[in-house]
């Protein structure tokens, strides 16, 4: 009796433990789900005044397994303000961060640049000697620390990110370089790299390369450079941007790869809704570390996407970068343990659906979030498809090929290949069948006589007596090769 009771208690305890393990022990405190009123934060003794701005604390719960919130610092560009351009305003949803914050349960910070740097309320990205304790870098790091250390926001210090436009894009890269221990991911929008001056925003100076920027970045990181091993980055720019040199976009990402060190593999280009094309890069461990997005036809602007502002260097007609970059950060975060580091599962169910003498048709099962699929023949990519089917043409007749398929995720790149399938193209010869007497077959060269018996040429199959009274059907399946019967 007692033994049975203890068994029941043990069962109840096991069930309770299983339930508790499936959910965070404490739900994150729900915020108001609205942008705050203007806040006043640390004083900037270098540029003057106090850092002011806004924050968004969502009512939704965080989506990460540890139940902690991500924190995103968003930096406006020159001649912009947080209230007029970044947060929701009379023109729309600003930079369009609110809906993304609700989706992921993330806290968003939108500060105003202190002082009047470069006479246009810019961020001081071109400071040749930035300090973690002074100027714009100092007050921004102080702001991040205020939220990370305030338990009511439940911020995960391993999920702190920064993104910005123009001078804010340049400052994004500065922060990523000088504080890689703070920022797990950065998103640079039309930002000049470290080591450039304000006079060089529109062109790449002679001799300036990604290595130049990487050397600056490493120097600023100092003793924190080891944290680059778990940081991820990306850059986005418009092909009609004539304010900041378009060449700085891929250069920014290349510089960060140099800082991260090791070998990188360029992935397949992936289309993003709104005219964007992303090129992901993976490290030697197969982890996605950088993205490079060019946006066709976009001028110098923050790519807010549908619903965002469409004025004063904010673009609502092209890609939604907040949606892209937040998904990119969450999927590929190397610190929080919540990201996969690469795209989703490889396609399953790859099968050969048809063959001809010059083509092979394939089909496979769809993969969630895949925007396209890569098709590989004998290990080399031969094409891509947005549907779950593909026909590979221009092949050699009577040849066997091996195929695999990958899934391409817009934010994380290409998956591992699927299981391989083999396909053999059909012979180029068109089979024909002839019915005649065995004697006629022998006389026509379709068969031969041996000891009064007719045999089909090639297969040497017996047809019976070689005379006018025995009739056979022979099918020519290849040049000089006949079988008894009709074409297969």
UniProtKB/Swiss-Prot annotation:
Keywords: Hydrolase, Lipid degradation, Lipid metabolism, Secreted, Signal. It is found in: Secreted. Residues 346-428 form the Fibronectin type-III domain. Residues 1-27 form the signal peptide. It is an enzyme of class 3 (hydrolase). This is Poly(3-hydroxybutyrate) depolymerase. Its EC number is 3.1.1.75. Belongs to the AB hydrolase superfamily. Lipase family. This protein degrades water-insoluble and water-soluble PHB to monomeric D(-)-3-hydroxybutyrate. InterPro entries: AB_hydrolase_fold, Esterase_phb, FN3_dom, FN3_sf, Ig-like_fold, Plant_Biomass_Hydrol_Est. GO terms for cellular component: extracellular region. The keyword rRNA-binding does not apply. GO terms for molecular function: poly(3-hydroxybutyrate) depolymerase activity. It comes from Ralstonia pickettii (Burkholderia pickettii). One of its GO terms (biological process) is lipid catabolic process.
């Amino acid at each position: 009796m007692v033994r049975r009771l203890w068994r029941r208690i043990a069962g109840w305890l096991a069930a309770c433990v299983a339930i508790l393990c499936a959910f965070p022990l404490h739900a994150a405190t729900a915020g108001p789900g609205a942008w705050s009123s203007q806040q006043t934060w640390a004083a900037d003794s270098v540029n003057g005044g106090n850092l002011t701005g806004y924050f968004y604390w969502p009512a939704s719960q965080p989506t990460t397994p540890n139940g902690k919130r991500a924190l995103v610092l968003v930096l406006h560009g020159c001649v912009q303000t947080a209230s007029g351009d970044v947060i929701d305003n009379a023109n729309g949803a600003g930079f369009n961060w609110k809906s993304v914050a609700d989706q992921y349960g993330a806290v968003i910070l939108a500060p105003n640049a202190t002082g009047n740097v470069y006479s246009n309320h810019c961020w001081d990205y071109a400071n040749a000697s930035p300090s973690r304790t002074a100027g714009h870098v100092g007050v921004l790091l102080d702001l991040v620390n205020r939220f990370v250390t305030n338990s009511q926001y439940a911020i995960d210090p391993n999920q702190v990110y920064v993104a910005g436009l123009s001078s804010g894009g340049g400052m994004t890269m500065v922060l990523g370089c000088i504080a890689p221990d703070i920022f797990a991911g950065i998103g640079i929008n039309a930002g000049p790299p470290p080591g450039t001056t304000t006079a060089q925003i529109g062109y790449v100076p002679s001799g300036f390369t990604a290595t130049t920027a990487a050397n600056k970045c490493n120097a600023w990181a100092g003793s924190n450079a080891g944290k680059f091993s778990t940081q991820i980055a990306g850059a986005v720019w418009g092909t009609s941007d004539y304010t900041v040199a378009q060449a700085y976009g891929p250069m920014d990402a290349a510089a960060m790869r140099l800082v991260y060190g090791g070998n990188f593999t360029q992935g397949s280009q992936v289309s993003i809704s709104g005219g964007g094309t992303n090129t992901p890069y993976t490290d030697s461990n197969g982890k996605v570390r950088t993205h490079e997005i060019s946006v066709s036809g976009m001028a110098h602007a923050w790519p807010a996407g549908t619903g965002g502002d469409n004025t004063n260097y904010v673009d609502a007609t092209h890609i939604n970068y907040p949606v892209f970059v937040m998904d990119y950060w969450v999927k590929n975060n190397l610190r929080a343990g919540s990201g996969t580091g690469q795209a989703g599962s490889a396609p399953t169910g790859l099968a050969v659906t048809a063959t001809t003498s010059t083509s092979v048709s394939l089909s496979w099962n769809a993969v969630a979030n895949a925007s396209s699929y890569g098709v590989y023949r004998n290990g080399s990519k031969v094409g891509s498809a947005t549907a779950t089917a593909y026909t590979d043409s221009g092949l050699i007749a009577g040849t066997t090929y091996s195929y695999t398929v990958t899934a391409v995720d817009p934010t994380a790149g290409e998956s591992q290949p699927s299981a391989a399938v083999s396909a053999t193209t059909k012979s180029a010869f068109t089979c024909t069948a002839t019915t005649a007497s065995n004697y006629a077959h022998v006389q026509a060269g379709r068969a031969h006589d041996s000891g009064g018996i007719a045999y089909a040429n090639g297969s040497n199959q017996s047809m019976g007596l070689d005379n006018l009274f025995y009739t056979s059907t022979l099918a020519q399946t290849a040049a000089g090769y006949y079988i008894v019967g009709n074409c297969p």
